[in-house]
Curated annotation (Swiss-Prot):
Consequence when changing L361E: Disrupts tetramerization, disrupts AML1-MTG8/ETO interaction with TCF12, decreases AML1-MTG8/ETO interaction with RUNX1T1, CBFA2T3 and CBFA2T2
Identification of the protein by name: Protein CBFA2T1
Chain's gene name: RUNX1T1
Family statement drawn from the similarity comment of this UniProt entry: Belongs to the CBFA2T family.
Biased composition (Low complexity): 95-114, 587-604
UniProt organism field: Homo sapiens
Consequence when changing L389R: Disrupts tetramerization, disrupts AML1-MTG8/ETO interaction with TCF12, decreases AML1-MTG8/ETO interaction with RUNX1T1, CBFA2T3 and CBFA2T2
């Protein structure tokens, strides 16, 4: 009994020591309750420093930032299974921080976490998507391609948010993206950023510097196939790859019997990025022996992806697309993007493609039109230069002819003078004049063209002068006609006004029944003189200021006229005439109102 207890304690001490060496002391300390460590715990630092050779300094360990080491020791949940490891070098959260509570069964963990193959596939899709965007911008124009490349680098460097990237990309290309682009970037961009951060830390640079130096690994079409999703990791050190220690060897005999049923699941928990992490130097197993040389990375990645997909998703049948991607030869990876794009274009996308092509054709037509205009301007400038050159050549020729027509003696003396170089210059100029310049039209054709142009100008000026004179004549005639009409209208208006005034005056003078104030029909008579007639008392009062001066005088004149009339009737033999022949002393305002008064007073 004592020996059994001693053997048990010896075994437990060995297990605890082994766990301390391997950094999994939590697993040994608490086998029955749920326990997990954060990726940036000191245990990770210890394990990383122990597993990394002395030639490669470990990446900086900051408690605030997440760990990006290629190997993160994962703890056990009830000692049954590992939490999924990093995707392409980016650690995934342990089981204690997953979406739901961890369970003791491996199937629940498979449902909660994403398989490494799926993560590698999504990362490859993201790289292929960014490369396609950059190529699409280059197809439009080099300037737009440069802008798209800057936007992609800013998105990966986290200097641009996904929404800003989406809006600026649409503004640069004038081409709307699909609706699933923003969710796709939000879901898969952190994988690429963690991978970039990991590679930058290994290279002792910040992500912006590393991406600026290794930009071709992100935007090169040859590195965006699914099997080459971790080419960014391969660029740091091609011969310094190490393998994460096998989980069965790492945890030893402490595995519970539940996992003995599926031993093939052990390699599937290691992502392709962890198998070939970019660490310098050789890697060592927990027993201190170096790992054997691994086979080519692509072969391992394909096997890992296929096995992980088969065992983790065994409850669902693989889709036709997955089988096609898995069984496609590696030589056809360059044409995979074109085939997928050709087969996945919808009617709306075809309409957008045609719209884009129409826009490109319109741009080409505009460029052709601008080029044609530029050539026309250049041709006109060349013609103007030729005309000016011919003009000066003709003037110089005329001047030379005049000089030649001068004195022959002076020319003879100049020819005999050895100092004067004029004959040589004249010969050179004569040779220049008679030698036709290459590309220039003969002078006769230019003269005819000038004469034709001048004739056209003269005809145009003549026609213009005729048109101007005709327009002036028509305008003058129109002004004269309108002026005559206006004068006739004014004269007619004046004549009509004069006739109306005379008619009114004559009507007032001829009417004996009209009012002396307003000219209407009179109904009353002035009681003072019985001569003035008014239409009413109002008009009589209005006219009294004028009428009272003559009202009494008229009455006195009538009384004085009555007295001689009576005396003449007594002495009929006197020489005085009849009272009808004697004019009154004072005449009324008008002769018409005085007539009835005379008629009325005569019988008296």
């Amino acid at each position: 009994m004592i020996s059994v207890k001693r053997n048990t304690w010896r075994a437990l001490s060995l297990v605890i020591g082994d766990c301390r060496k391997k950094g999994n002391f939590e697993y040994c300390q608490d086998r029955t309750e749920k326990h997990s460590t954060m990726p940036d715990s000191p245990v990770d630092v210890k394990t990383q420093s122990r597993l990394t050779p002395p030639t490669m300094p470990p990446p900086p360990t900051t408690q605030g930032a997440p760990r990006t080491s290629s190997f993160t020791p994962t703890t056990l949940t009830n000692g049954t299974s590992h939490s999924p490891t990093a995707l392409n070098g980016a650690p995934s959260p342990p089981n204690g921080f997953s979406n739901g509570p961890s369970s003791s069964s491996s199937s629940s963990l498979a449902n909660q976490q994403l398989p490494p193959a799926c993560g590698a596939r999504q990362l490859s899709k993201l790289k292929r998507f960014l490369t396609t965007l950059q190529q699409f911008g280059n197809d439009i124009s080099p300037e737009i391609g440069e802008r798209v490349r800057t936007l992609v680098l800013g998105l990966v460097n986290s200097t641009l948010t996904i929404e800003e990237f989406h809006s600026k990309l649409q503004e640069a290309t004038n081409f709307p993206l699909r609706p699933f682009v923003i969710p796709f970037l939000k879901a898969n961009l952190p994988l690429l950023q963690r991978e970039l951060l990991h590679c930058a830390r290994l290279a002792k640079q910040n992500p912006a510097q590393y991406l600026a130096q290794h930009e071709q690994l992100l935007l090169d079409a040859s590195t965006t196939s699914p099997v080459d999703s971790s080419e960014l990791l391969l660029d740091v050190n091609e011969n310094g790859k190490r393998r994460t220690p096998d989980r069965t060897k790492e945890n030893g005999f402490d595995r519970e019997p539940l996992h003995s049923e599926h031993p093939s699941k052990r390699p599937c928990t290691i992502s392709p990025g962890q198998r070939y992490s970019p660490n310098n130097g050789l890697s060592y197993q927990p027993n201190g022996l170096p790992h054997p040389t691994p086979p080519p990375p692509q072969h391992y990645r394909l096997d890992d992806m296929a096995i992980a997909h088969h065992y983790r998703d065994s409850y669902r049948h693989p889709s036709h697309r997955d089988l096609r991607d898995r069984n496609r030869p590696m030589g056809l990876h360059g044409t995979r993007q074109e085939e997928m794009i050709d087969h996945r274009l919808t009617d709306r996308e075809w309409a957008e493609e045609w719209k884009h092509l129409d826009h490109l054709l319109n741009c080409i037509m505009d460029m052709v039109e601008k080029t044609r205009r530029s050539l026309t301007v250049l041709r006109r400038c060349q013609e103007a230069d030729r005309e000016e050159l011919n003009y000066w050549i003709r003037r110089y020729s005329d001047a030379e002819d005049l000089k030649k027509g001068g004195g022959s003696s002076s020319s003879h003396s100049r020819q005999q003078s050895p100092v004067n170089p004029d004959p040589v210059a004249l010969d050179a100029h004569r040779e220049f004049l008679h030698r036709p310049a290459s590309g220039y039209v003969p002078e006769e054709i230019w003269k005819k063209a000038e004469e034709a142009v001048n004739e056209v100008k003269r005809q145009a000026m003549t026609e213009l002068q005729k048109a101007v004179s005709e327009a002036e004549r028509k305008a003058h005639d129109m002004i004269t006609t309108e002026r005559a009409k206006m004068e006739r209208t004014v004269a007619e208006a004046k004549r009509q006004a004069a006739e109306d005034a005379l008619a009114v005056i004559n009507q007032q003078e001829d009417s004996s029944e009209s009012c002396w104030n307003c000219g209407r029909k009179a109904s009353e008579t002035c009681s003072g003189c019985n001569t003035a007639r008014y239409c009413g008392s109002f008009c009589q009062h209005k006219d009294w200021e004028k009428h009272h001066h003559i009202c009494g005088q008229t009455l006195q004149a009538q009384q004085q006229g009555d007295t001689p009339a009576v005396s003449s009737s007594v002495t009929p033999n006197s020489g005085a005439g009849s009272p009808m022949d004697t004019p009154p002393a004072a005449t009324p305002r008008s002769t018409t109102p005085g007539t009835p008064s005379t008629i009325e007073t005569t019988p008296r």
